[in-house]
C-alpha cells in the first residue's frame, strides 16, 4: 500500500510539472507573438515615415496618369493637339504651294505691262505721258483704266480722249470675258457692227426700255452694268472706263 501511494504521488507531481511546463511554453509563445506584432507595426510605421520624408524631399510632378484606366489624359490631349497642328500645317503648305505660282505669274504679268508702257513712253513723244502716269490694267495688247468718279457720257468720252485713249469699246468675246471679271459699271461705246451684234445676241443681255420719241434722243447712250447693256440718259452721270490698244 505505501508503495502504491508513492507511485500515485509521483504521477501527480509529474502531471503538475508537465502542466506548468506547458503553461510556461504557451506564455512564451504569446509573448513572442505580441513581440512580433509590435515589431511588425513598428516596421510599418518606420516605412511610412521614410516614405513621407522621401516624398517631401523629392516631390513628384503631376502627370495626370490614371492608374485605374492605365491612360494619361495629358498624353491624349497632346496627341490631339499634334494631329490638329499637323493637319493645319499640311493645309497651309498646300495653300502656299498654290499661291506662290500665282504670285509669280502676276508679278511677271505686271512686269510685262510696265515694260510695255515704259517702251511706249520712250518711243513716243510727250503726248503719251498721260498713259504712263496712271495704273493701267492690261489684257494682251489692250489697256484699261477704271474711273469710279461719275461723268456724263460726253464728259467721259472727252476725259478718255485727254488721256490719248477712248471710251471702253468691247469688240471681242475674249475681251468681254476678261472685263466681266471686274463687274464693270459705266459708260461704253456702243457700235452696231457685226461683232457687237454677235456679242449682244450671245453673251450680253440687253435691257429693253420703251421710250417715246422725245426721250429716245436723250437715251441714245449706253452703259454696261455687269453683263447687261442698257440705254441711259446721256446727261446722267455714271462711272466710266478708258481703253487704248497697242497694235
Curated annotation (Swiss-Prot):
Quick check: keyword Glycoprotein in the entry?
A: yes
TM segment ranges: 80-100
Parts forming coiled coils: none
Answer whether the UniProt record assigns the keyword Lipoprotein to this protein. no
Gene Ontology CC annotations of this record: external side of plasma membrane; plasma membrane
Q: Which cysteines are joined by disulfide bonds?
A: 160-242, 221-234
Give all residue intervals belonging to the C-type lectin domain: 139-243
User: Per the UniProt annotation, where are the glycans attached?
Assistant: 125, 196, 212, 218
What spans are recorded as compositionally biased (Basic and acidic residues)? 1-12
For membrane topology, the record states: Single-pass type II membrane protein
Which key words tag this protein in UniProt? Cell membrane, Disulfide bond, Glycoprotein, Lectin, Membrane, Receptor, Signal-anchor, Transmembrane, Transmembrane helix
GO terms for biological process? positive regulation of natural killer cell mediated cytotoxicity; stimulatory C-type lectin receptor signaling pathway
**Topological domain ranges for the Extracellular compartment:** 101-247
UniProt-annotated stretches for the region Disordered: 1-39
* GO MF annotation terms: carbohydrate binding; transmembrane signaling receptor activity
The record's listing under Pfam families reads: Lectin_C
Could you say which tissues express the protein in this record? Expressed in natural killer (NK) cells.
Q: Where is the signal peptide?
A: none
Regions of this protein lying in the Cytoplasmic compartment: 1-79
Q: What does this protein do?
A: Lectin-like receptor for natural killer (NK) cells. Heterodimer formation with KLRE1 mediates NK cell cytolytic activity.
Q: How does it assemble?
A: Heterodimer with KLRE1.
Q: What is this protein called?
A: Killer cell lectin-like receptor subfamily I member 2
What organism is the protein native to? Rattus norvegicus (Rat)
